[in-house]
């Protein structure tokens, strides 16, 4: 059985607490590796603060201002 995975979602990866995945003080390839681990195409450390990923599957939870629960 073949399985097709849609990968068209971009966004910030989230920690379990609802906060963006921090990349402060991490190695340069940290975000790209984390994004690829989540089946995304690529990613980078936005402003040295949080991991932003490209072309992730729709099932990956990403941070959203509307549903933000970080620090709450």
From Swiss-Prot:
Q: Where in the cell is it found?
A: Secreted
Main localization is secreted
Biological process (GO) annotations held by this record are: defense response
Signal peptide feature range = 1-7
Q: What does the entry state regarding organ or tissue expression?
A: Expressed by the venom gland.
Give the matching InterPro entries.
LCN-type_CS_alpha_beta_dom, Scorpion_toxin-like, Scorpion_toxin-like_sf, Scorpion_toxinL, Scorpion_toxinL/defensin
> Ranges for the LCN-type CS-alpha/beta domain?
9-71
One MF term in the entry's GO annotations:
toxin activity
Superkingdom of the organism of origin: Eukaryota
Question: Keywords assigned by UniProt?
Answer: Disulfide bond, Ion channel impairing toxin, Neurotoxin, Secreted, Signal, Toxin, Voltage-gated sodium channel impairing toxin
Disulphide connectivity of cysteines: 19-70, 23-45, 31-51, 35-53
Report the GO terms under cellular component: extracellular region
Q: Which Pfam families match?
A: Toxin_3
Q: What does this protein do?
A: Beta toxins bind voltage-independently at site-4 of sodium channels (Nav) and shift the voltage of activation toward more negative potentials thereby affecting sodium channel activation and promoting spontaneous and repetitive firing.
Domain comment, as recorded: Has the structural arrangement of an alpha-helix connected to antiparallel beta-sheets by disulfide bonds (CS-alpha/beta).
Which family would the database say this protein is a member of? Belongs to the long (4 C-C) scorpion toxin superfamily. Sodium channel inhibitor family. Beta subfamily.
Q: What is this protein called?
A: Putative beta-neurotoxin
Q: Which organism is it from?
A: Tityus pachyurus (Colombian scorpion)
